[in-house]
Amino acid sequence: MSSQVIPALPKTFSSSLDLWREKNDQLVRQAKQLTRDSRPSLRRQQSAQDTLEGLRELLLTLQGLPAAVPALPLELTVLCNCIILRASLVQAFTEDLTQDLQRGLERVLEAQHHLEPKSQQGLKELWHSVLSASSLPPELLPALHCLASLQAVFWMSTDHLEDLTLLLQTLNGSQTQSSEDLLLLLKSWSPPAEESPAPLILQDAESLRDVLLTAFACRQGFQELITGSLPHAQSNLHEAASGLCPPSVLVQVYTALGACLRKMGNPQRALLYLTEALKVGTTCALPLLEASRVYRQLGDRAAELESLELLVEALSATHSSETFKSLIEVELLLPQPDPASPLHCGTQSQAKHLLASRCLQTGRAEDAAEHYLDLLAMLLGGSETRFSPPTSSLGPCIPELCLEAAAALIQAGRALDALTVCEELLNRTSSLLPKMSSLWENARKRAKELPCCPVWVSATHLLQGQAWSQLKAQKEALSEFSQCLELLFRTLPEDKEQGSDCEQKCRSDVALKQLRVAALISRGLEWVASGQDTKALSDFLLSVQICPGNRDGSFYLLQTLKRLDRKNEASAFWREAHSQLPLEDAAGSLPLYLETCLSWIHPPNREAFLEEFGTSVLESCVL
């Protein structure tokens, strides 16, 4: 690029430039001082806002003059300082920042008389016009590269990666056909150094380039972790860890590396990275959550639950206000983790639920019951609006939490407490149910409005029946199981692809069938306990008709037929059942409360009995 002759400055203008530069330098020092300010957050924020206003006023003064090359380095530097401080204050890149960038580029073209009147060029076109100008003065390059780095930051944060690639190719002097590897382009970019004396800048182009480099490596690594490109994710995450990585981001990177190694089948190495993440010390929630997953993979239940307990504590701790950031840092360029990402930590209540559910699943019913009660106390707070149908897929909805809590209480032998939870749930959901007389006619219409409500109420009656059964109150248990079945046989399955994860599990055809089977077998067992085998037989037979191949139902049906001395019917049923394909395991696709209910009716000697019965049938056939 050839330099152009710069006319001598009038003495008064030169003096004004010196004053304006001093003003810029003073404001920059003021902004940097705020990072060491120990005053309360609101006062620091106000001071930063005042500094930004000072920079904006200075910028308006400079932009109010005719565009001139001698003043442009200062003007562009002030513009960069405004953008950096503004983005730091709001911790985001708002759309109006593009107007500032556009105005800065237009001023560069105006100074060189290259801007056409009433030009409507976009940012891409303006950058091309500025950077391809043959007469671009060298003294403008440092400030222009800083402005370009802010443009790069904006485009990365808004996922305009093609525009960013083209800009970097132009800055590197590359042709369009050259490398499109953003990581390589960022490494190749070497912003020119400022010549002394130059106006102070909050963050120069080289610093911003390093931020971009680390942020892009993080973004790529995190995304590849989600999509399953684990070797590429590992490579990018190592790149990020070796770069300009602030502590909060380093925790995420080490945790992501741990998740990557866990998925690659290296849990022990994963723990090493998670230990490093904990040593960084800014936040321990994320590595603790990942550690619980690693310990679960290793089968170390005690360590898994301990990690989850520490996670709940970590998320409940109050954090002191962070120091003010007057710079653009890597965090600003990282999107919020997707709920499906291993880097999504969630809230304290979500962590508490995870702990409670894992306690229930691993046989620690007493602990599970206490955790569920704590969780419900935390979430409910007297608000009935939380019992509306779920709208997100982030874990179970409140009614399902109540059902899980009741199941945990029954499992822990606390039937009366379980009844209390169930009564509370019924009180809060009864107003959402249509009247029984009109339920059948309105089933389809109501299913669209309140798709899970009939299932919630049915499951509540099932759990109440189990609680009464534990208390040896057969009459009440039979009544609850019957109410459950009456409602269930009026409930229609829904499209499993619609709604949240909570809705899909509770409304699926498989879930409804299993819920009916659980209620029928539970009622049948109460009939058996009261000596009414004929009524029990009817329920057991209906359960295997609903779910052909269900081995629990088959066990109870065969036992009852045997007790009633109906051996021929039992043999015929066994032969028919034996010819059917085994029922697929529905575990994992069912709500946790239902899995727990099904575990209660699962006879421990089922397989031995069925095998022995089958052998006797075959022997009788031979004879």
Curated annotation (Swiss-Prot):
Disulfide bonds: none annotated. Its main location: nucleus. This is Fanconi anemia group G protein homolog. Transmembrane segments: none annotated. It comes from Mus musculus. The keyword Phosphoprotein does not apply. Keywords: DNA damage, DNA repair, Nucleus, Repeat, TPR repeat. GO terms for cellular component: chromatin; Fanconi anaemia nuclear complex; mitochondrion; nuclear speck. It comes from the Eukaryota. DNA repair protein that may operate in a postreplication repair or a cell cycle checkpoint function. May be implicated in interstrand DNA cross-link repair and in the maintenance of normal chromosome stability. Candidate tumor suppressor gene. GO terms for biological process: DNA damage response; interstrand cross-link repair; mitochondrion organization; ovarian follicle development; response to radiation; spermatid development. TPR repeats lie at residues 251-284, 349-382, 458-491, 517-550. Belongs to the multisubunit FA complex composed of FANCA, FANCB, FANCC, FANCE, FANCF, FANCG, FANCL/PHF9 and FANCM. In complex with FANCF, FANCA and FANCL, but not with FANCC, nor FANCE, interacts with HES1; this interaction may be essential for the stability and nuclear localization of FA core complex proteins. The complex with FANCC and FANCG may also include EIF2AK2 and HSP70. It is found in: Nucleus. Gene3D superfamilies: Tetratricopeptide repeat domain (1.25.40.10). Highest expression levels in spleen, thymus and testis.
